[in-house]
């Protein structure tokens, strides 16, 4: 934040609290993965922490809602996730979305993002 000029834009993106809490409740292994998510951020506290560093909060939005269910399945079947039918099927569904971008899946993703979005992005302006 020290190199950003006043009026500059800053984006912070973190795992969204609700979907991440579900993952942590379903699997201790998930939360202990090397390089994994180290903590769960609360939206209001993260905004306040960044504002305290000299930024103005502009907006936030959530993304990747259809990924939440995939991670919940992986956490639920952690030990057998590589061979589990549901995890495998849902992974194919996500690959379809990523590679082909069917409009109906985009619609579902956008519809569910406000509640189930796996990631949340925060937009700020430097004072």
Positions of PLM-derived features:
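Conserved S-adenosyl-L-methionine
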Residues: 55-65
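Alpha/beta-hydrolase-fold catalytic nucleophile elbow
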Residues: 13-14, 63
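A short glycine-rich, Lys/Arg-flanked "PGG" loop and its adjoining helix->strand segment in the class I
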Residues: 1-9
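A structural motif corresponding to the C-terminal end of an alpha-helix
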Residues: 49-55, 126
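A conserved catalytic-core signature of glycosyltransferases
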Residues: 36, 41, 117-119
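Positions that flank functional sites
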Residues: 19, 65-66
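A C-terminal cap/extension of S-adenosyl-L-methionine-dependent methyltransferases
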Residues: 25, 67-127
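Short, glycine-/aromatic-enriched active-site segment of Class I SAM-dependent methyltransferases
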Residues: 15-39, 47-49
